[in-house]
Swiss-Prot record:
Serine/threonine protein phosphatase that may dephosphorylate and activate lipin-like phosphatases. Lipins are phosphatidate phosphatases that catalyze the conversion of phosphatidic acid to diacylglycerol and control the metabolism of fatty acids at different levels. May indirectly modulate the lipid composition of nuclear and/or endoplasmic reticulum membranes and be required for proper nuclear membrane morphology and/or dynamics. SUPFAM superfamilies: HAD-like (SSF56784). It is found in: Membrane; Nucleus envelope. Its EC number is 3.1.3.16. Belongs to the dullard family. One of its GO terms (molecular function) is protein serine/threonine phosphatase activity. Disulfide bonds: none annotated. It comes from Caenorhabditis elegans. It holds the Pfam family NIF. This is CTD nuclear envelope phosphatase 1 homolog. It comes from the Eukaryota. Disruption phenotype: Excess of internal nuclear membranes in oocyte-derived pronuclei that are nearly or completely bisecting the nucleus in embryos during nuclear closure. Increased phosphatidylinositol (PI) production and ectopic ER sheets. Nuclei contain openings through which imported proteins passively diffuse. Increase in embryo nuclear size. Twinned nuclei after mitosis. Simultaneous knockdown of chmp-7 or lem-2 leads to enhanced nuclear sealing defects. The chain crosses the membrane at residues 3-23. One of its GO terms (biological process) is nuclear membrane reassembly.
Length: 246
């Protein structure tokens, strides 16, 4: 009798674990692909249209790791990623003559975010990671749309105490029309008035940070100098989270 009870218990436990894993994968897929609409195509008034024509088209600089995506390589799983979490895509690159496979997780709604903001801004990728890695990730995020053509990598950064910094003036000398979206305050420490902080992302399927930024970015493009708005947000995110570069 005891053996039968143990068998039933093991079966139920296995079934429960299977159901739990299936539920996690299903809920993650639902959160990622749920229909989201930001009504950016609503016709603007003549006055608003004229205002937009009088200001320069802005540049939005985008970080990759922990801002738009999170990745880990060859089975090395960060503690923030739950075991068994499926990746959105994988890339294979050669680093120091060794082939390395990266499993890449996309931040929720990143594809929709890029499709919308590319209509408002010139998009530039600026990552402190190596070019061979950053190029592969940017290619996958671009999805053949040609919206992530301009790219800057580790060799364009400056190594300082605490990590890499990114020189926005190397992208465009007019700092009034450029802003950077980055999870690492150290990356934009020399350009705090051009920064749009965003919390680091690792695996939360319910994250909505990119969606939440759309109304703000929609409005920011109308200003003549982004620093007049971004300089008011001086409460940068604390540098307590580790930054991993590839």
């Amino acid at each position: 009798m005891t053996t039968i009870a143990q068998s039933v218990f093991c079966f139920l436990a296995g079934f429960f674990n299977f159901f739990l894993l299936y539920f996690r994968k299903t809920s993650r897929a639902y959160c990622k692909y749920q229909v989201v609409k930001y009504h950016s195509n609503i016709p603007m008034s003549p006055l608003t249209t004229h205002r937009l024509l009088t200001v320069k088209r802005k540049i939005l600089v985008l970080d990759l790791d922990e801002t738009l995506i999170h990745s880990h390589h060859d089975g090395v799983l960060r503690q923030t990623v739950k075991p068994g979490t499926p990746s959105d895509f994988t890339i294979r690159v050669v680093i120091d003559r060794h082939p390395v496979k990266f499993s890449v997780h996309e931040r929720p709604h990143v594809d929709y975010f890029l499709s919308v903001v590319s209509q408002w801004y010139e998009l530039v990728v600026f990552t402190a990671s190596m070019e061979v890695y950053g190029t592969s990730v940017a290619d996958r995020l671009d999805r053949g749309r040609g919206i992530l053509k301009r790219r800057y990598f580790r060799q364009h950064c400056t190594m300082e105490v605490g990590g890499y910094t990114k020189d926005l003036s190397a992208i465009h000398p007019d700092l009034s029309s450029i802003c950077i979206l980055d999870n690492s305050p150290g990356a934009y420490r020399k350009f705090p008035h051009n920064a749009i902080p965003i919390p680091s992302w690792f695996s939360d399927p319910n994250d909505t940070c990119l969606l939440n930024l759309l109304p703000f970015l929609d409005a920011l493009r109308f200003t003549s100098d982004v620093r007049s708005v971004l300089s008011r947000n001086m409460q940068a995110l604390p540098e307590t989270q580790s930054v991993q570069y590839y």
